[in-house]
Amino acid sequence: MSVRVDRAAAQTATVSFDRLNPLGRKVAPNTNALALIIGVDSYKSTSARAIYADSDAQVFSDYATQKLGISPGRIKTLVNDGAGEREMLLSVKSWLSRSVKQNQSDVYIFFAGHGLASDDGSKMYLLPYDGAPELLDKTAILRDELFADISAANPRSVTVFLDTCYSGTTRGTDMLIASRPIAIRALEQSIPDNFTVMTAAAGDQTAKPLEEAKHGMFSYFLMKGMEGEADANNDNEITAGELHSYVQANVIQQSSGSQTPELQGDADRVLVRFQ
């Protein structure tokens, strides 16, 4: 990645970022892998947007093919009003469960949109298009239950990318719940043994957009890293640890330290294999 600074005048500077490009270096196919990709920018029950989340998901679909080696027929993408609670749950309980080859399939989950924690921080939720922030238990997807449903399909591995936060803040300036004026710190939770989870921010932080690139900040550097930027030792493979290190360093820099991506699980898991 290169960052260019153009000075139109002594007092102004415009930073521009390279366009994302999933083409380029070829990767080895991952025949049995599959991906469920979800992005919700605009919601039915709240005016607070998750800016660029839908385009993040649509572009990540190309990276799933071109950089994770997944066949297009084994990728399911849900965006905006197509990512309601029913559609999300059926995609996991029906489509994913049928598509997984037990102990052979690597599963990839990408979610960009709003997340929320319970008032005590003990539960983490992903908000579907038709979810109501004030009724999390009834209308949102509990992260632990989502992971349990995926794990029940018995895949070989599961890698989850979450461009969301759980503090109740948004990619803009709004709070998801007006009656909750302060950010809630989500408590760290355990994950199943074969899961690796990369999240955009710490439990009490906001997952921000990268306005210059018109993507979520985490999503932009995630995909830029998958192009090859994250291959720190130049061995033609990108591990979860390498990708996380690249994303974390760039997000911390661009957010001036206010957003710190986190990694749970196997840092040595190879995600991208260049030919």
Where are these regions (language model features)?
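Glycine- and acidic-residue-enriched helix-capping/strand-helix junction motifs
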Residues: K44-Q58, D62, P209-A213
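Active-site-proximal beta-strand/loop segments in catalytic clefts of secreted hydrolases
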Residues: L36-D41, L78-G82, F110-H114, L127-G131, ...
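Functional beta-strand-loop-alpha-helix junction segments that form "active/interaction loops"
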Residues: Q11-P22, A57, S61-S105, D137-K138, ...
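Caspase-like (clan CD) cysteine peptidase catalytic core
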Residues: N32, R86-A112, L116-M175, E242
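Short acidic/polar inter-strand loop motif in beta-rich domains
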Residues: R4-T12
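Short glycine-rich His-centered loop
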Residues: T31-A48
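Caspase-like cysteine protease fold
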Residues: F17-R19, L23-K26, A230-Q275
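Extracellular S/T/G-rich loop segment that most often corresponds to the catalytic His/Ser-adjacent loop
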Residues: V158-Y220
